[in-house]
Regions:
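Short, polar/acidic, helix-capping and beta-turn segments at strand->helix junctions
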Residues: 2-114
Length: 114
């Protein structure tokens, strides 16, 4: 999975619905998606070797009362939707905490060209 790191720093830290707004978490999920794309492209030999996104799982570090995990996950899905033609399946899961205090983590399964 990828957390929202840019230039070695998290773009936000804390629980969504408490320290992190849903809008900031949406943007953090976009960063996670781009980081996942970069990691997969490196393994596959370039972004042009990635045919499509199959599945996206978005973990959202949520305050006890936050129930908008799907809106945060839209940050990743919307990003992939702009880059790939075919839709993907997705899960959005609320969790108590993530590594380094990240507000979200995105796990992606890509299909590489054969």
């Amino acid at each position: 999975g990828q957390i929202p790191v840019v230039d070695g720093e998290l773009v936000a830290t804390g629980l969504v619905g408490a320290e992190v707004s849903p809008q900031d978490a949406y943007r953090a999920a976009q960063v996670c998606a781009l980081n996942a794309l970069a990691a997969a492209a490196e393994v596959a030999g370039g972004v042009d070797q990635l045919e499509r996104v199959l599945k996206v799982t978005v973990f959202v570090a949520s305050s006890p009362t936050f129930t908008g995990q799907a809106s945060v996950a839209n940050g990743a899905s919307d990003t992939f939707g702009k880059l790939f033609d075919q839709p993907h399946i997705r899960s959005a899961v609320g969790v108590a905490a993530l590594p380094l205090g990240a507000p979200c983590e995105v796990e992606v399964e890509f299909l590489a060209r054969s």
